[in-house]
Amino acid sequence: XXNERKVIQ
């Protein structure tokens, strides 16, 4: 699929 939520704090 497609992951458009990649946020690493």
Swiss-Prot record:
It comes from the Eukaryota. On the 2D-gel the determined pI of this unknown protein is: 6.0, its MW is: 12.5 kDa. This is Unknown protein from spot 2D-0014LD of 2D-PAGE of liver tissue. The lineage of its organism: Eukaryota, Metazoa, Chordata, Craniata, Vertebrata.
